[in-house]
UniProtKB/Swiss-Prot annotation:
Gene3D superfamilies: Immunoglobulins, Laminin
Disulfide bridge map: 478-531, 566-577, 571-588, 590-599
Protein known as: Protein vein
Signal peptide: 1-40
Location relative to the cell: Secreted
Chain's gene name: vn
Length: 623
């Protein structure tokens, strides 16, 4: 509009007056700009005065304390000072003031030993300088005390110089998150964190020895076993014993209360126990596969030889009463020795054979044994029964192969049969080739003074009164006597455990039986075990009981004086490594400045920084 009026008026005036008119117009415009600038400066001065008046209200007693210096990085100081000079709007400063006030109110409300009250919090004025260009001597000069007049002058000068916003935010995050800004600050804040404040991260992991396990320490138990006397067991009536076996109830009330009270703990122990058994089974399968892979054809040849000569390759840790000549001779009504005279040509499935009786060791009273006996046999893939109590008289004798019987005059066999009529026989067990030991066992078994009732002579546990680790094996041995050799069955808490092959392992020998707990667990495997023995001499059952108690072993909690020095590098920052051999555990004794399992973390500094209103202050902890 000025230009339009000037153009219209210039057309009417003379050309000599034009320079004077332009000078007057420029002078008027200059006056308007001066008035606007003066009003802006007055507003800025008023805001600065309000800020200086507001500082003593928030923090009391700050002028009495000595000043501290805060080193700033050269990059942040230079770049942020230029940006602060360019941005000078009053709205941005007012919003930043509100944010800083909120942060300070949060700091005062923290529940800690160092920030519990305002008396412990001391705000100290500080001087801002460039850390990159200063020397240690210059830093010491800044730390010196400053008179009150010089402090006021420095505050006025610092108020004109604005601290970069990124530095303020980084120092506030440093205070809020206990001196560990890298864990809580955003990626934008991490760019302004000094490298010295970052937590130390080890470059490489120490190499542990081959015998060290990284898994947590295994629990251990003190095993105590004692045999229960018969007086403690005869108090119960037979009806109560039968009811407890049928219902599965536990007469020990304290144990039942303990189970109901710690049901969740028992379930967790059972899950751990099951998991350990599964891991052990996997390891056993892998070991078996490795052994089979190494053996190769040699293992296959051994298997073929065992199939052809089964009796020669029986397992030594297993006693089969159904293959004991004494057991068969005592159980069979008729026992004789003979040779095969003829056999069927086709012996693939079923065949018959004629035997000539050479010697009779035992015979039925009502029937006379003929000289030639016709017997029937059948082939079976199974090796037959191992328990004499499960062995039955069969019309056909079971054989693994037709080649097991040889037709020769110098090869005799011992037969255990029952004569149903003069021409028919049932066979007990398998034909047994005659040797000196077989003849001696049969002659002893058919004698009149052979029988002896079964008896349990001793029962004990291995180990006893010793420490066993969780998941290891526990053995319970039961020694028996009697003729014929007794059969042993195992019970736990009045319940049979003979079918629990996944939890227990049984090794039956001629005069003793071993119960092996595959993976011992105190909650499920501790209790009362019973060994019962019987034989065919009488119906009486001999029994003995043993109580297994497992008490958890507690190692000393003060590990500063326990353990032996490690022979490998495990701890960081000059930490001392110690090892406890009993539980295979490694721990570190850290210096005062570090903490953690391997001394990998550093304690935060006791000084915290607060940056607000263009100034940087220090918040100290009084310990």
């Amino acid at each position: 509009m000025y230009a339009q009026h000037l153009r219209k008026w210039s057309l009417k005036t003379k050309k000599q007056l034009m320079p004077l008119i332009l000078l007057i117009i420029s002078y008027m415009l200059l006056l308007n700009t001066c008035v606007l600038s003066s009003s802006a400066t007055t507003q800025q001065q008023q805001q600065q005065q309000q800020q200086q008046q507001h500082l003593p209200r928030l923090w009391e007693g700050s002028a009495e304390e000595s000043s501290y210096y805060i080193p700033l990085s050269s990059d942040n100081g230079s770049g942020s000072s230029e940006s602060s000079a360019e941005s000078g709007s009053s709205s941005s400063r007012s919003s930043s003031n509100n944010i800083d006030n909120n942060i300070l109110s949060r700091l005062l409300s923290l529940n800690s030993n160092s920030l519990s009250s305002r008396s412990n919090v001391k705000l100290k004025p500080a001087t801002v300088f460039d850390a990159g260009s200063s020397t240690p001597a210059q830093q010491e000069q800044h730390v010196a005390a400053v008179p009150e007049q010089q402090q006021q002058q420095q505050q006025q000068q610092q108020s004109m110089q604005k601290v970069p916003n990124t530095l303020i935010n980084s120092q506030i995050y440093n205070l809020l998150y206990n001196g560990m800004p890298s864990e809580a600050a955003s990626s934008k804040m991490r760019r302004h964190i000094q490298p010295s404040q970052l937590p130390h991260q080890p470059e490489s992991r120490a190499q542990l020895p081959s015998n060290y396990s990284s898994r947590p320490a295994v629990r251990s138990y003190l095993i105590e076993s004692y045999e229960m006397p018969e007086s403690m067991l005869e108090d119960r009536s037979p009806e109560q014993a039968a009811r407890s076996r049928r219902d599965g109830s536990n007469t020990n009330g304290s144990r039942q209360q303990q189970r109901t009270g710690h049901r969740q703990q028992l379930q967790q122990d059972k899950r751990d126990h099951r998991r350990q058994r599964q891991d052990q089974q996997k390891e056993q399968r892998q070991q078996q596969q490795q052994r089979q892979h190494k053996s190769g054809n040699k293992h296959q040849q051994q298997q073929q030889q065992r199939r052809k000569h089964q009796r020669k390759h029986q397992r030594y840790n297993r006693y089969c009463s159904a293959r004991d000549p004494a057991q068969l001779a005592f159980a069979a009504p008729t026992v004789f020795q003979g040779v095969f005279k003829s056999m069927s040509a086709d012996r693939r499935v079923n065949f018959s054979a004629t035997m000539k009786v050479e010697k009779v060791y035992k015979q039925q009273h009502d029937l006379q044994l003929p000289t030639l006996v016709r017997l029937q046999f059948a082939l079976s893939n199974s090796s037959g029964e191992c328990d004499i109590y499960r062995e039955r008289l069969m019309p056909r004798g079971m054989l693994r192969s037709g080649n097991d019987l040889q037709q020769a005059s110098d090869i005799s066999y011992m037969m255990f049969v029952q004569q149903t009529n003069p021409g028919n026989f049932t066979i007990l067990g398998q034909p047994m080739r005659v040797t000196h030991l077989v003849v001696e066992a049969v002659e002893t078994a058919v004698s009149e003074n052979y029988t002896q009732n079964a008896e349990v002579t001793k029962i004990f546990s291995k180990p006893s009164k010793a420490i066993i680790k969780h998941g290891k094996k526990l053995r319970i041995v039961c020694e028996v006597s009697g003729q014929p050799p007794p059969k042993v069955t195992w019970f736990k808490d009045e319940k049979s455990i003979n079918r629990k092959r996944n939890i227990y392992q049984f090794k039956h020998h001629k005069r003793r039986s071993e119960l092996i707990v595959r993976s011992f667990n105190s909650s499920s495997d501790a209790g009362r075990y019973e060994c019962r023995a019987k034989n065919k001499a009488s119906k009486a059952i001999a029994k003995r009981r043993i109580m297994i108690k497992a008490s958890p072993v507690h190692f000393p909690t003060d590990r500063s004086a326990s353990g032996i020095p490690c022979n490998f590098d495990y701890c960081f920052h000059n930490g001392t490594c110690r090892m406890i051999p009993d539980i295979n555990e490694v721990y570190c004794r850290c210096p005062t400045e570090y903490f953690g399992n391997r001394c990998e973390n550093k304690w935060p500094d006791s000084r915290y920084f607060v940056a607000i209103y263009g100034q940087i202050h220090t918040l100290n902890n009084d310990y």
